[in-house]
């Protein structure tokens, strides 16, 4: 299964192949990412799920030996064409990485930094944007009295929510999360999962996770990948309760991976 017919598509992947040098890492991937829903990518290490995620904002262009072939349509426009404005694409498609990566600056400036690249706001408007982003990331009440302290002064879970706030401050349309909870404790993980569920009201969210329970709790749709291939893509409840492919069933029941 490669299509999920529910909400309108925000991202459409068509015949996508990806290479690290001569290594064929993604093989003829086809799937639709639903707008304003959460889509999870699961599969064993090395299956290609993070590679696929990073094609959505062309992170691979930082590395000359990596290349993508096929189409990735964002609202109908193929982002893989050379005419695509990378800065504009990454404003539309934000990303949060596995380990919290606050900038070496204040909590306030962590949020304002990206906004300043794309918008010229008055101080009052910037203050409002910072509060809005931190509130969306469920971090405002914990930081409102120390906005000028370093982002490094926050706990790991708070730092990850700061990174999410930073990502949404420029008001993207899509938010990519690459194993955002793998370095966090269970309480922080629970807060991030609640946040992911809330964020889909305003954003299309795509998350890579090793944690199948997390995918089941957070996502509307789940893609199972194995050795660079998309094995199954379905509504999350269906994929975990009545998988269509034996490989999927074997993985979610712990028989391999």
UniProtKB/Swiss-Prot annotation:
What EC identifiers does the entry list? 7.3.2.1
- The broad enzyme category this protein falls into is translocase
GO cellular component terms?
Answer: ATP-binding cassette (ABC) transporter complex, substrate-binding subunit-containing; membrane; plasma membrane
Q: Which reaction does it catalyse?
A: phosphate(out) + ATP + H2O = ADP + 2 phosphate(in) + H(+)
Among Pfam families, the record links this protein to: ABC_tran
- Give the record's keywords alphabetically: ATP-binding, Cell inner membrane, Cell membrane, Membrane, Nucleotide-binding, Phosphate transport, Translocase, Transport
Biological processes per GO annotation: phosphate ion transmembrane transport; phosphate ion transport
Q: Where in the cell is it found?
A: Cell inner membrane
Membrane topology qualifier: Peripheral membrane protein
Tell me which PROSITE patterns the record gives: ABC_TRANSPORTER_1, ABC_TRANSPORTER_2, PSTB
Its Gene Ontology molecular function terms?
ATP binding; ATP hydrolysis activity; ATPase-coupled phosphate ion transmembrane transporter activity; phosphate transmembrane transporter activity
- Where is each ABC transporter domain found? 11-252
Please name the SMART domains in this protein's record. Answer: AAA
Report the principal subcellular site: membrane
Binding annotation for ATP:
43-50
Sum up the protein's function in the record's words.
Part of the ABC transporter complex PstSACB involved in phosphate import. Responsible for energy coupling to the transport system.
**Quaternary assembly:** The complex is composed of two ATP-binding proteins (PstB), two transmembrane proteins (PstC and PstA) and a solute-binding protein (PstS).
- Which protein family is named in the record? Belongs to the ABC transporter superfamily. Phosphate importer (TC 3.A.1.7) family.
Q: Can you say what this protein is called? A: Phosphate import ATP-binding protein PstB
| Organism of derivation | Escherichia coli (strain K12)
Q: Which gene encodes it?
A: pstB
């Amino acid at each position: 299964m490669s299509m999920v017919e529910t909400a309108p598509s925000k991202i459409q992947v068509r015949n996508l192949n990806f290479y690290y040098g001569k290594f064929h890492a993604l093989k003829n991937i086809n799937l639709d990412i639903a707008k304003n829903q959460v889509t999870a990518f699961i599969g064993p290490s090395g299956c290609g799920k993070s590679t696929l995620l990073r094609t959505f904002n062309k992170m691979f262009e930082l590395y000359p030996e990596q290349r993508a072939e096929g189409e990735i349509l964002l609202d109908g426009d193929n982002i893989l064409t050379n005419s695509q404005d990378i800065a504009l694409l990454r404003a539309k498609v934000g990303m949060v990485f596995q380990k919290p990566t606050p900038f070496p600056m204040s909590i306030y400036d962590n949020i304002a930094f990206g906004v300043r690249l794309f918008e010229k706001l008055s101080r009052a408007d910037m203050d409002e944007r910072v509060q809005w982003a931190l509130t969306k990331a469920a971090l405002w009440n914990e930081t409102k009295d120390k906005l000028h302290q370093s982002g490094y002064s926050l706990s790991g879970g708070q730092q990850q929510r700061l990174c999410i706030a930073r990502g949404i401050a420029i008001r993207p349309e899509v938010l990519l999360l690459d194993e955002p909870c793998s370095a966090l404790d269970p309480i922080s993980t629970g807060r991030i999962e609640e946040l992911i569920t809330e964020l889909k009201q305003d954003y299309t969210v795509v998350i890579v996770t090793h944690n199948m329970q997390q995918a089941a709790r957070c996502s509307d749709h789940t893609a199972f990948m194995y050795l660079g291939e998309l094995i199954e893509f379905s509504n999350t409840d269906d994929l975990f309760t009545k998988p269509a492919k034996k490989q999927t069933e074997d993985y979610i029941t712990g028989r391999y991976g």
